[in-house]
C-alpha cells in the first residue's frame, strides 16, 4: 500500500469512526421514539432497532462521506485549492475559517435577492429537457449557457459580503469547480428544481469566468457502467453537467488511484472499524 493509499484509508477510517460514535450516542433515544410508533408495534424489537440504525446511518453518513471527499480532494489539488472559504475574487470579509464546517463561498453578490433568484429559476425552467426517446431534447442548462448568469448576477452586487454553503468546491488548476453532491445517489423529482437552482445560485455568486458547476453523486444508483436515470436530468444537460459515481471519484482521487482501488480502501477501513460487530453489539445492548 502506498503512502497516498494509506492516507485515503485513514481518512475514511477517521470520518466513519466519528459517524459510528455519533450514531451510538443517540441510538437508544431514537429507538425509544420508534417504540411509541403504533404502526411498528407488531414488529420484533430487533427488527425495529435495525430499522432505526439504517435510518440513522443513511441520514448521517452523507456528511461523513462528503467530508471524506473534501479531504481526498485536498490530497490531489492541495489545501489551498480546496479552501474552507471559497473566495477567488478576494471579497473582503471577517470570517474565521475555524468556525465553519464544510465550505462556504464568499461573494459581494446578494444571493438572497428575490429578483436574482427569480431570474435563475426562470433560466432553469425555460431550459428543461423535453420529449422521450429519439425525440428527446436535452436540457439547455450547459457549461456554456450558465455563463450568461455571471453578468446578470453582477447587477445584484451589494455592500459588504454574503456567504453560501457549497457541498464541494475546488480549483483544478484551470477552473473553479462547484458541486451539488448527493450521498443518496439521486433526488426525487419534487426536489430536483430547487437543488439545481441552489447550485446555479452558488455558481452565479462565485462569479468567475473560469468556473464549472456539476451535479454529483457518490454512487451510480443504476450500477456502475449503466446509464444513470436521475430526475435532475430534466433540469441539466446530461452527461455534460453531471459527475456520477465512478466519474466523480476519479475526478478527485489523487493521480494513480482509480475508483476501483478507492472502494477497496473504503472496505478495508470499515473492516478495521469492525463496523458490523459494533452495530450488532449496539443493537443487542439496546433491545435486551
Question: What do the PLM-derived regions correspond to, one by one?
Answer:
Residues 1-95, 285-288:
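Nuclease-adjacent, charged terminal/linker segments that flank catalytic cores
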Residues 3-18, 228-288:
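Non-catalytic C-terminal interaction segments of nucleic acid-processing enzymes
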Residues 54-56, 150-157, 182-190:
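Surface-exposed cleft-lining segments at the edges of enzyme active sites
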Residues 73, 166-185:
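Conserved catalytic cores of phosphodiester-cleaving nucleases, focusing on short active-site segments
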Residues 79-81, 204-212, 234-246:
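Structural alpha-beta junctions
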Residues 85-173:
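Active-site metal-binding core of divalent-cation-utilizing nuclease and nuclease-like domains
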Residues 177, 203-234:
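Nucleic-acid nuclease catalytic cores
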Residues 184-207:
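Mg2+/Mn2+-dependent nuclease catalytic core
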Amino acid at each position: 500500500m502506498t503512502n497516498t493509499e494509506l492516507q485515503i484509508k485513514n481518512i475514511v477510517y477517521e470520518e466513519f469512526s466519528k459517524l459510528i460514535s455519533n450514531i451510538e450516542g443517540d441510538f437508544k433515544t431514537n429507538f425509544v421514539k420508534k417504540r411509541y410508533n403504533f404502526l411498528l408495534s407488531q414488529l420484533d424489537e430487533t427488527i425495529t432497532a435495525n430499522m432505526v440504525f439504517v435510518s440513522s446511518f443513511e441520514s448521517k453518513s452523507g456528511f461523513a462521506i462528503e467530508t471524506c471527499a473534501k479531504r481526498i480532494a485536498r490530497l490531489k489539488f492541495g489545501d489551498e485549492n480546496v479552501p474552507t472559504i471559497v473566495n477567488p475574487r478576494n471579497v473582503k470579509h471577517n470570517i474565521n475559517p475555524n468556525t465553519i464546517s464544510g465550505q462556504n463561498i464568499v461573494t459581494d453578490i446578494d444571493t438572497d435577492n428575490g429578483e436574482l433568484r427569480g431570474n435563475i429559476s426562470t433560466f432553469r425552467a425555460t431550459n428543461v429537457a423535453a420529449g422521450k426517446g429519439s425525440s428527446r431534447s436535452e436540457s439547455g442548462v450547459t457549461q456554456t449557457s450558465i455563463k450568461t448568469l455571471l453578468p446578470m448576477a453582477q447587477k445584484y452586487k451589494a455592500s459588504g459580503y454574503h456567504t453560501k454553503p457549497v457541498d464541494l468546491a475546488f480549483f483544478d488548476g484551470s477552473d473553479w469547480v462547484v458541486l451539488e453532491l448527493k450521498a443518496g445517489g439521486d433526488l426525487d423529482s419534487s426536489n430536483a428544481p430547487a437543488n439545481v437552482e441552489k447550485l446555479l445560485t452558488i455558481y452565479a455568486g462565485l462569479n468567475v469566468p473560469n468556473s464549472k458547476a456539476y451535479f454529483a453523486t457518490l454512487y451510480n444508483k443504476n450500477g456502475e457502467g449503466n446509464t444513470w436515470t436521475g430526475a435532475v436530468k430534466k433540469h441539466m444537460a446530461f452527461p455534460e453537467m453531471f459527475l456520477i459515481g465512478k466519474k466523480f471519484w476519479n475526478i478527485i482521487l489523487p493521480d494513480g488511484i482509480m475508483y476501483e482501488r478507492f472502494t477497496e480502501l473504503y472496505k478495508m477501513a470499515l473492516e478495521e472499524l469492525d463496523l458490523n460487530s459494533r452495530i450488532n453489539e449496539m443493537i443487542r445492548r439496546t433491545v435486551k
